[in-house]
Amino acid sequence: MSDFSPIAGRAPRLAVLIDADNVTARNASAILDEIASFGEPSVRRVYGDWSSSALTQWKEQARDLGLVMHQQSANTKGKNASDIGLVIDAMDILHAGKVDGFVLVSSDSDFTRLASRIREDGLQVIGIGEAKTPESLRKVCNRFVLIENIVSGSDTPTQPKSGRTSDVQAVKEPPLKAIPFILDAMKKIDPDQDDYSLGHLGQAITQLHPDFDPRTYGSSRLSDLLRKIERFEVFTQGSSVKVRDKA
C-alpha cells in the first residue's frame, strides 16, 4: 500500500501531525497502524487544547500510543489555535530536513495550503481524514485515506448505523462505480495499450485520484476489486500481473 520507496535500506521517515479537534480519539490506534504501512512515524505529534474536557480520550490515547501532545490554548479569535501550531511545527520540521514525508491527520480544509507547500519542497504528503473532508485537501495530497475505510475493514457493503452519528461508518460503493477511475488510469498510461501492469495501473489511479481506495468498494486490494468487475480480466504473464479491458 505504501507510496514511498525504501531509502538507503530503511523505511521512509514520516512526520505524523494529528489535529485532535477534527479526529475522533477512538480511531487513533487504527490510524497509526495504517500509517505504519507507509513508513516509520519518527515524529508523532497531536495538537489540541489539553485543558479542554473534550480531549480527555485523546489524552489517554496519546499516552498509550506514544504521541507527543502539543498544547494549543484556544485564545486565537477567528482561527483554530491548534491549526496554527500544527502549521508552524510542520514548517520547522520541513526546514530541518530530517523526514522524507508528512502525514496530516485532519478533515480540515485549512491544511490544504500546508500540504501544497510541503509538496513544493519535493516531499510527499499523505492525508488521513473523514469522508467529509473537502476535495481541496484530498486532491492536493499524494495520497488521501478515508478514516471510514481504515476502521471499517473491507467486508460486504454496509450502511451507517442509525443513531450513531459520532462514529465514522463507511458506506461501501458497488464495484462498478470504480470503473471510471480505472479507465482514466488506462488512458493516462496509453489508451491504445491492450494489457496493463497491475502495479503501473495502481500508481496511475492514485496519481489521478489520490483518495481512490479499493476498500471503498469492498475490496482490500486493487486486484480483488478488478476481479469483481466482469469488464476487466486479471491474469499472470510470466512474473507480472496484468489487467485487460475486455470491453
What would you call each of these model-derived segments?
Residues 116-156, 232-242:
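Intrinsically disordered, low-complexity glycine/proline-rich and charged
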Residues 47, 100-107, 114, 118, ...:
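Acidic beta-strand-to-loop metal/phosphate-binding motif
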Residues 16, 24-27, 31, 54-58, ...:
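Helical mechanochemical/support elements of P-loop NTPase systems and associated helical scaffolds
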Residues 19, 46, 90, 104, ...:
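A residue-level signal for conserved active-site and pocket-lining positions in enzyme catalytic cores
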